[in-house]
Amino acid sequence: MIRPVSGLFILLASILPLLASPRASADDRPYDVLRHNYAPYCTPGDDLAFPMKIWGLAKDQHTFWRGSRDLLFTWVKNHARDWLDDKDAYLVTHGDLHLGNIGTYVREGQLGATSFGPVDFDDTAHLPFQVELLQGLITIRLSARQNDIDLSGPRREEIAHALYDSYRKAIASDKSTHDLVSDERQITKFIDQAQKHTYDKTLGKFTDDTGHFLRYVQTRHAQEKGLVPKEILRPAMDRADDMAKSLAQAIERSPAARAAFRYSDVATMRHSIKDVVLRTRLESVGSQGLKKYLVLLDKPLKGLDMDVVMYVKQEIPSAAERAGAIPMDPRSPGQRCAEDMDVLTNPSAYLNCWCDIGKESYWVSFKEPWSDEIELENVRNYPKLLEMTRVWGSVAGAMHRQQGSAIAAAILQRLNRPELFDQLRHRSTLYMATLDREYADFMSDPRARAEAAKAQAKLDAAKAQVTAEANAR
């Protein structure tokens, strides 16, 4: 049963795992840092929790980079003190703006209308803009490495200038993110494709014909090939009372949500819950292993005469906080995520709420078919990489510029100093060398292999069950 709790209580519950033992040091091995900073927020004994996080990180170096931001911010804390000391350069940053965290999202207004910009705000943090730019240059260079795109000769310099110049152009502009990227051919096609779907697609993906969630999310082709499911959905109706109270709490906090929902009181919310599952999405890595609930509600939204899948996602202190690069945010993690998302998106999202469940904090939205992220596998050659580099700069610049003219002026002043461009190039190279060492160490660590093996056993069992069910039909 959920009882009212103060914001201070939730904050303390969020940071106590980090205070329980000495902070991971720069000399710790990567596995040690991740176990210290991340594992305390995962359910002990659940092999689809922290072991699944380790399993995801072991996929390849690019995925390791995406999911190990604690290591980056530990490095920044020790090697970029001049940036961290530049207090006039601080603003709300996304904190994890790789290409897969850029895409379409459902915006405020008519249901199904979309905009383009940053998505997935788990790691928002108050940081100097230079740190966000550093992450951008690293992510572009690693994207090239992942897709075997040659950056020798003048290309590495050209990529760095493309990111820097597109970011500066966006900071100096008054255009929206959508307008800034409208000339990029890949993005125009991407946005048009996302708007063609109806909500039936989401229900068909996650639910059966009886008003319940599927146990596995997988295409029929993948079933026939005997592949591991893309998602595992574990029954969690024992959390239905908690979900009803948390959803009512989240909707009550948001005027936009109150306007969108037909009902928001706890009793009606509980009566309308058809099913609850705990979601594990194999392609996730940044928040892999944390609790993510899907809640099937009976026709809750105005203007949509069908059931809706709500998404209740556990939030924890950002990677920058966990690494000690910045102080702990006084807000609960769910509140930070939702409020920072409002700051970083324009127009605002259709549904963006937060709630607290016991000692945990959650971000609340809904699953829909119109949001989509850029997929790295589609960035297949140098011209496409160059285009995505400009897109990254435009998205980051618009996101930062909309926080006020004083911030924009401070950023432009620093961008006009040649030494900043040189620092970004140099520090991206230094960190990539560090990343090479850390990834090699992680992959050779027997403790990481043992954790990943626990998750793999669960996935193998799921694959066997899906195959057996397909053969029985």
Predicted regions and their residues:
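N-terminal secretory signal peptides that target proteins for export/translocation
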Residues: 1-5
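Conserved ATP-binding subdomain of kinase catalytic cores across diverse folds
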Residues: 24-47, 56-95, 99-197, 263-451, ...
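Acidic catalytic cores of enzymes that act on phosphate-bearing nucleotides/polynucleotides
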Residues: 201-274, 279-280, 284-285, 296
